[in-house]
Amino acid sequence: MAEDTVMPPVHPGEILLEEFLTPLGVSQYRLAKAVDVPARRINEIVHGQRRITADTALRLSRYFGTSERFWVNLQARYDLETEKDRLGTELDGIRPLSEAS
């Protein structure tokens, strides 16, 4: 019988690396130059050490031909899942308004 395993949230940088850079043969440095940002920014995103900001989302979407919302939504989903994990059962103590009356 398989154990229930909770997968950690996937950082948008992992998506950037695994779904875009690696398959397309684009280096982090090449991407940074193409979208006019410091190479360190791309490296930190790829390593999960930096968020994808609106500025970066606009640049990535232009370069890869995706929507801006694609990148922003990846980051928002990651942020929500990470925060949900951090809060743990603390949210269980909050009664919804409809149940509070």
Language-model-derived ranges and their functions:
Residues 2-26, 73:
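A short, Lys/Arg-rich alpha-helix, primarily the initiator
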Residues 72-101:
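Short, charged recognition helix plus adjacent turn
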Residues 1-4, 99-101:
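Intrinsically disordered, low-complexity and often Lys/Arg-enriched segments
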Residues 26-44:
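Short alpha-helical DNA-recognition segment
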Residues 49-62:
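Short, basic-rich loop-to-helix N-cap that marks the start of a DNA-contacting helix
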